[in-house]
Curated annotation (Swiss-Prot):
DOG1 domain: residues covered: 252-469
Keyword DNA-binding: yes
Biased composition (Low complexity): 143-153
Name this protein carries in UniProt: Transcription factor TGAL1
Similarity annotation: Belongs to the bZIP family.
Places the protein is found: Nucleus
Domain bZIP: residue ranges: 185-229
Region (Basic motif): 187-207
Example GO molecular function: DNA-binding transcription factor activity
SMART domains reported for this sequence: BRLZ
Native organism: Oryza sativa subsp. japonica (Rice)
Cellular component terms (Gene Ontology): nucleus
Source species taxonomy: Eukaryota, Viridiplantae, Streptophyta, Embryophyta, Tracheophyta
Length: 472
């Protein structure tokens, strides 16, 4: 019963307070305007930065809060509220511009008990520092005073929208920064790729330059060796301003170098053949080596043909051979018939058929050599007669000059046949070697090639010993 009486008394008091409030509405219109004016004059430093405070504390502005009647308020979890009197003050609140919001972290609270419904009444403002705020956190205690009410801040939506725009602007700036970084990264990668490509080209140029230097060094070494060999043979190359003589000299020097290279490779083939014969290799292995040596002989005959077109006298005189080899030379090379005589005693035992074949080959080679020798003698005789005719006439006459030019033209035509004689002599040598290979077996052919190589090697050694002999 006593509880019922207390409840009824509380209800009556609440009703009376509401009636008093409604009765005073008409007289409070002017103070509303005054309150609105005072709020406009509030210093920006006293306005609480609700957005920043809520963001730093981890709460949202639109959440609710409870304020006590003494001016201090308790914030619920993630909530801010403003306490209004039961009287309706719809027109006294003015939106606070974000430009006026500072980080002073103060809260201005209107105490509804100080509002007097009289014209020109002043609003009692209570400024509470953030140091006086209590009970931040998870609080579920609500103020049940009949003079308390919860309402949403009028500019909450606007602040939320501005806050969301700020959050959207941050990713945009981040995306712009990322794109800038991506551009820098792409530019850096492109520069690195260009640097790597330039370094690779530089290495290739350096490698090519080194290879050119190495090849030039090898060519210089070969030329020095040829000059040394030419000095040992008593060759003195004279310089001339005549372009044709210079060209022939270059051709002769090139042939000498090619012959030195050929001789070196020939010695390698002979060493391989000698090792195979000493190891008693099979006929198939020996045949491949013999064929390679025969092909190598064919190569030197081709080189001589090219050199004869540049300087036929150089090839015919055997200036690319040692002095001892030149002593036994015939038309720029060896005599086939003489070589077969030397091999007859080296290849025993031979069958009757092989002996007959060697004899016939030797006879035919001798006949061909005699024919070429006779043709060479006839050429020399004709050339001598051409140059000697008309040399007893008076010097300086126009007729003698014309006769002289005619004689030189005839002599030049006859010298052109020297190249033909040289080519026929080389063909005879090559055919003799090929016929000998057909008559002999593979192993006998290998022994014959070794004997020929040893013969010319001894001639070269004899020439070196002769040039190096002590002179009194």
């Amino acid at each position: 019963m006593e509880g019922g009486r207390l409840g009824g008394a509380a209800a009556s008091a609440s009703a009376a307070a509401a009636a008093d409030a409604r009765g005073g509405m008409s007289g409070f219109a002017a103070p509303q305007h005054a309150i609105h004016t005072n709020l406009n004059n509030v210093q920006p430093t006293q306005v609480t930065d609700f957005g920043a405070l809520a963001q730093s504390a981890g709460f949202r502005i639109e959440d609710l809060a409870n304020l006590s009647t003494n001016g201090l308020f308790n914030l619920k979890s993630n909530a801010h509220t403003i306490i209004n009197d039961p009287l309706q003050f719809e027109n006294y609140v003015k939106s606070i511009s974000p430009s006026n919001i500072t980080t002073t972290a103060t809260v201005t609270v209107v105490d509804p008990q100080t509002l007097v419904p009289q014209k020109g009444a002043q609003l009692n403002l209570v400024t509470i520092r953030t140091g006086n705020v209590e009970n931040w956190g998870e609080s579920t205690i609500a103020d049940t005073s009949p003079r308390t009410d919860t309402s949403t801040d009028p500019d909450t939506d606007e602040r939320n929208q501005m806050f969301e725009q700020g959050q959207l602007a941050a990713p945009t700036a981040s995306d712009s920064s990322d794109r800038s970084k991506d551009k820098l990264d792409h530019k850096t990668l492109r520069r690195l790729a260009q640097n790597r490509e330039a370094a690779r080209k530089s290495r290739l140029r350096k490698k090519a330059y080194i290879q050119n230097l190495e090849s030039s060094r090898l060519k210089l070494t070969q030329i020095e060796q040829e000059l040394q060999r030419a000095r040992q043979q008593g060759i003195f190359i004279s310089t001339s301003s005549d372009q044709s003589h210079s060209a022939s000299g270059n051709g002769a020097l090139a042939f000498d170098m090619e012959y030195a290279r050929w001789l070196e490779e020939h010695n390698k083939h002979i060493n391989e053949l000698r090792a195979a014969v000493n190891a008693h290799a099979g006929d198939n292995d020996l045949k491949s080596t013999v064929d390679s040596i025969m092909a190598h002989y064919n190569e030197i005959f081709k080189l001589k043909g090219v050199a004869a077109k540049a300087d036929v006298f150089h090839v015919l005189s055997g200036m690319w051979k040692t002095p001892a080899e030149r002593c036994f030379m015939w038309l720029g090379g060896f005599r086939s018939s003489e070589l077969l005589k030397l091999l007859a005693g080296q290849l025993e035992p031979l069958t009757e058929q092989q002996l007959a074949g060697i004899a016939n080959l030797q006879q035919s080679s001798q006949q061909a050599e005699d024919a070429l020798s006779q043709g060479m003698e006839a050429l020399q005789q004709s050339l001598a007669e051409t140059l000697a005719s008309g040399s007893l006439g008076p010097a300086g006459s126009s007729g003698n000059v014309a006769n002289y030019m005619g004689q030189m033209a005839m002599a030049m035509g006859k010298l052109g046949t020297l190249e033909n004689f040289l080519r026929q002599a080389d063909n005879l040598r090559l055919q003799t070697l090929q016929q000998m290979q057909r008559i002999l077996t593979t192993r006998q052919s290998a022994r014959a090639l070794l004997a020929i190589s040893d013969y010319f090697s001894r001639l070269r050694a004899l020439s070196s010993l002769w040039l190096a002999r002590p002179r009194e």
